[in-house]
């Protein structure tokens, strides 16, 4: 074999290795192209980056928004009593309790009662709408069942029955319907869950005196709502006779003018 046809073994190995690793070729080609067109590569890289940022950009979270998400919802109602409903313990009878609700927010607020014992309890009124600063007394009725096996019911202890009071911000002029709370579930706030406590009806106590006082106020509020509103229109006298004050004054004036004219003629 001629000497000119022979090749150096080390050179042949480098060629074979270069063929087996094609990414070296791509790398060299890329580096050469980037060297030839540096401005074009810079624009393409930075242009793509700006497009991606604008596509995924989101408004930054502020401390106030994070705090609002962590803090509980602000209450709209002030309750009295605030945690428990006191009932006189009289087995076999329907007893009453009372609670005062006041709208402490700056907007009209609807409220609604719910109970875990709807068969033996009901509220009057079951719900309503309060203007800012307005108050209402609600009366809660409950039937007290006889204890099983003639066991004596422990007094001044929490019962299993609970009442939940919910609130909802509404616009002025909106009338209360229970469906309001179903249509706007995301905006409903739970004001309080009240537990039932039975107290001795024959033993004087501060809780019993306060309960009697609130029941009297609730009854007075119900009677006041039953009275018709005061009349602001024309007064009605007899059967369909409407007396307008302006017409009455005008008739008196005309009568006085006629008397004066008669006196002048005489």
UniProtKB/Swiss-Prot annotation:
PROSITE patterns named in the record: MSP
Short name of any one Pfam family annotated for the protein: Motile_Sperm
Induction remark: By treatment with mannitol.
CC terms in the record's Gene Ontology section: endoplasmic reticulum membrane; plasma membrane; plastid
InterPro entries according to UniProt: Ig-like_fold (IPR013783), MSP_dom (IPR000535), PapD-like_sf (IPR008962), VAP (IPR016763)
Domain (MSP) ranges: 76-199
Alphabetized UniProt keyword annotations: Coiled coil, Phosphoprotein
GO annotation (BP), single: response to osmotic stress
Residue ranges of coiled coil: 200-228
Basic and acidic residues biased stretches: 219-229
Region listing for Disordered, in residue ranges: 28-57, 219-239
Family recorded in the similarity comment: Belongs to the VAMP-associated protein (VAP) (TC 9.B.17) family.
Function of the molecule: May play a role in vesicle trafficking.
Record's protein name: Vesicle-associated protein 4-1
Species: Arabidopsis thaliana
Taxonomic path: Eukaryota, Viridiplantae, Streptophyta, Embryophyta, Tracheophyta
